[in-house]
Amino acid sequence: KGANVKVVMTPASKEFVTPLTLSTLSKNEVYSSFTSEDDDNAQWNNHVDIAQWGDLFIIAPATANTMSKMVSGTCDNLLLAVYLSAKCPVYYAPAMDLDMYKHPSTKDTFKKLNDFGNFQIPAEVGELASGLSGMGRMAEPQNIVSFVEKNILDQLPLKNKCILITAGPTYESIDPVRFIGNHSSGKMGYALAEAAASLGAQ
């Protein structure tokens, strides 16, 4: 979709996918600890700078452990530090086993996270890590992207507005043969149309 993506991993997530894989896909450095893992030239990974860099923050998968720490303000890894420092919209995609998903404490966690102003991406029904099948599977990546896109579009100031923009040269007849015109390229009209579309207009 053209977005510039930076990845922040938890220590546990590296047991499922390597930082190199995500770095290759995102074409950016992957952050997983407060300092770089190069022992010879370790550098501080400033969680505030990372948080302020993004226009939005997606936590996927959001495990029961991570979500409970988001609620309590626990800050024992880089991801949680970035979350607490983020001023941009935050989306989270829950992922856990069926019984964990249905547990009252999890429902309470959802409510508190949503009350904080975060956006919950609905979990899906499917095969779970336990081998069982049911609600709690993380939304598919394409569904996460679609959810975020729709949520952004719904908040745009020109949503559901229809705008007519003329572009290009104009001609005013003097008589059946002659006219007054101009050499307009239409670029201004195209620019206005693109700007209106980016604000949600049709």
Predicted regions and their residues:
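A cross-family phosphate/adenosyl-ligand binding-site feature
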Residues: 1-91, 98-186, 190-202
